[in-house]
């Protein structure tokens, strides 16, 4: 009788421990309040504005999916790539610019699901800007000038401009007087407007973001060239995110992007007007541009 009783108590204890363990595991599952889905953004615009828009979208996502999200804006594009590359990952979702996404995808740490729509298109262009009286009218004039870029991994602000400078006979490594890392496209425009840089490159048309602070920016800072088409940024997932969870988030984001409130939040963060579903193959034509230029994607991380 005593032995049976002891066995019964042992079984009850084991059951209680396993239930408690399972409950603890459930509480710590990804997307729970204690273990939120981390969504990392790059600082393509003014960081406070990007952060505010990202947080609004995350709140809407939580309401739609029941998952908890933790958003952050990295100080550099490479910071998001490194967060995805960590083991365990320090980012489960990302909104990477084109080149940074290709770099992360080549490492096997990011998979595209959504591409942003701006002005009705899932692609965009970069632009070269300078002061209206600078005397600079084409890329070949950049030699000996100070160039402002948003980030070393920014597609429209540095990667494509590098390719176009080389094509025009200007070596970006040796022929420029200086390269200024402005930190965002907004501050590239500011640098050119204030004379801290002779020329810069941004997405089209980053100048509009500064019209409130500089009412004459559209007149004083002029566009002297527009780059080839570039796939827009979007939403990417770490491969460890399950298809089920990924599908729920994608569906919710598509729903959010169709509402006025959602559009406003997406526009605040990144000037996104909508979202389209595209996988990694959407970026293949741009990969071909990089390959044709002889650019080593991973070398730029070193």
Tell where the protein language model's regions lie, with residue ranges:
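Sec/Tat-exported extracytoplasmic proteins
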Residues: 64-68, 88, 95-98, 105, ...
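Bilobed "Venus flytrap"/periplasmic-binding protein-like clamshell domains
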Residues: 34-64, 99, 122-190, 194, ...
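Short, low-complexity disordered leader/linker segments with a strong preference
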Residues: 1-34, 130, 302
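Ligand-binding "clamshell"
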Residues: 104-116, 210-224
